[in-house]
């Protein structure tokens, strides 16, 4: 993912906020945890995630994003909403590092599905289960923000067009906002 704006900053400086994309959010886990039933395995994919009973997450190890990451709020909401007590939490700095740890079976993790490109297609298919949870979002908007009065407006508009026309369409599981 390029980034996300999950909170609109409250400040004296007027901002222009332009939505540019929507990215899929998934809970991913190594197949060894058995979160997706055998009869659902054939169809389980980032395009067809399994609706998971949150109780199955009790006492599992988690890969947690740092508080500065937009996914941290989703992680905290999940813990609070379902009363989940992780067996352990590994806090990572980079979501792709967390995905590699998840792939090795060290925990379950919320991700933007766009980062799945960082592991092989074979690992995506054979190693990981893909889930969504009731009452939690399965996507999030991404926006670009800039100061209303800036001399860089032509450059910003050009950058937004490049993002929408060249970069975002090449990201997995991410939709351009018209």
Where are these regions (language model features)?
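Conserved sugar-transfer catalytic core signal across GT-A, GT-B, and GT-C glycosyltransferases
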Residues: 23, 97, 140
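A late-sequence structural motif
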Residues: 129-173
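Short beta-strand-centered segments that line the small-molecule binding cleft or hinge
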Residues: 1-31, 36-40, 119, 129
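Secondary-structure junction motif
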Residues: 35-39, 43-82, 152-160, 170-176
């Amino acid at each position: 993912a390029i980034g996300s704006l999950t909170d609109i900053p409250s400040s004296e400086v007027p901002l222009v906020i332009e939505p540019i994309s929507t990215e899929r959010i998934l809970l991913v886990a190594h197949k060894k945890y058995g979160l997706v039933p055998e009869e659902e395995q054939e169809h389980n994919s980032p395009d067809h995630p399994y609706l998971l009973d949150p109780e199955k997450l009790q006492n599992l190890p988690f890969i947690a994003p740092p508080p500065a990451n937009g996914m941290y709020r989703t992680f905290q909401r999940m813990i609070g909403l379902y009363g989940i007590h992780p067996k352990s939490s590994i806090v990572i700095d980079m979501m792709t590092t967390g995905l590699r740890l998840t792939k090795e079976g060290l925990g379950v993790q919320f991700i933007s599905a766009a980062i799945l490109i960082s592991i092989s297609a074979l690992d995506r298919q054979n190693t990981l289960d893909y889930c969504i949870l009731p009452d939690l979002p399965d996507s999030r908007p991404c926006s670009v923000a800039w100061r209303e009065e800036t001399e860089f407006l032509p450059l910003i508009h050009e950058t937004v067009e490049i993002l929408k026309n060249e970069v975002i369409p090449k990201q997995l599981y991410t939709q351009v906002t018209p």
